[in-house]
Regions:
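Helix-coil modules at protein/domain termini and other flexible surface or pore-lining loops
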Residues: 1-148
Length: 148
């Protein structure tokens, strides 16, 4: 898991998982790992939506994915995250989840997009990881606010 976090470029943050609602005016920027432009310092809070699947049995696979839809005009949207032992299952779960979420909202979100990754366990444990980063936040303000 730590190796996957390092590969993604988020290992030195305290990850705070969010539910999957993309705020209005958000811009999704897709990048290959590692993420190079995350502002913040060692130990800062990092708000994320994350999918992870770990396996430690030889000849098994770990798959993780995040799917999203986003209104082009407002920037608001939805993320979903799924994990499993096959790419097909993860992609299917992402599609079904987003279709269900879109059916309950009166918004034209456009096409489903997704990022899915997989790792094969040969001998050592592996972790498939996909991370959507919102923003980082220092602890300094939080600590000083709590002391006053």
């Amino acid at each position: 898991f730590d190796s996957a976090l390092n590969h993604a470029g988020v290992a030195n943050f305290n990850l705070i998982r969010l539910s999957s609602v993309i705020p209005p005016k958000s811009k999704i920027i897709y990048t290959n790992p590692p993420i190079k432009k995350i502002e913040g310092n060692w130990g800062d809070k990092l708000f994320v939506v994350m999918a992870e699947q770990r396996v430690d049995t030889p000849n098994t696979e770990a798959w993780a994915g995040i799917g999203w839809v986003q209104d082009k005009n407002t920037g608001k949207g939805l993320f979903v995250e799924h994990e499993g032992n096959s790419e097909k299952k993860v992609r299917s779960d992402i599609t079904q989840s987003l279709e269900a979420l879109m059916a309950t909202r009166n918004v034209n979100f456009g096409e489903i997009q997704m990022k899915v990754v997989g790792r094969s366990c040969k001998h050592e444990p592996v972790c498939a990881l996909v991370v959507a980063v919102y923003q980082s936040q220092s602890w300094e303000k939080s600590i000083s606010e709590n002391l006053n």
